[in-house]
């Protein structure tokens, strides 16, 4: 909240390294959260909070109109893909999804905060990142 930007601290530093590993950075991607504020005690957002902010998230996606969407963590996955989906089963798989008026390719991976707590899972995220790099190439997306 002090910084006013998503993914700061150790999780943000790890996210920056993850992006850099596939030749991306915060200047050529758009990063946001499911809700636009930090919950008390950094708890998982309630269903009411998610429902209240989902129209804003959808509008962000429509405005940015990305070709690829990377969901980091179960909150993003369950909000945008489905609430019964388990991240360990969903990660590393492409899904074509319509969000608002935007049709895009969606892939899920582990949240950087989870990877800090479970560093053995970084190898799975590396696989996901390589899939993103490949999809960028396949879709001929120009990165500035």
Task: Identify the residue ranges that each predicted region occupies.
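A polyanion-binding, active-site-adjacent surface
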Residues: 1-144
């Amino acid at each position: 909240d002090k910084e006013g930007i998503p993914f700061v601290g150790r999780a943000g530093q790890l996210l920056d390294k993850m992006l850099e590993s596939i030749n991306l950075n915060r200047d050529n991607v758009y990063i946001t959260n499911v809700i636009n504020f930090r919950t008390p005690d950094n708890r998982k957002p309630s269903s009411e909070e998610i429902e209240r902010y989902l129209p804003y998230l959808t509008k962000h996606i429509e405005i940015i109109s990305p070709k690829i969407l990377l969901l980091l963590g179960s909150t993003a996955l369950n909000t945008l893909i489905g609430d019964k989906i388990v991240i360990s089963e969903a990660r590393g798989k492409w899904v074509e999804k319509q969000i608002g008026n935007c049709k895009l390719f969606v892939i899920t991976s582990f949240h950087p905060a989870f990877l800090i707590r479970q560093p053995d899972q970084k190898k799975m995220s590396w696989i996901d990142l390589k899939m993103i790099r490949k999809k960028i190439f396949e879709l001929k997306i120009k990165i500035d």
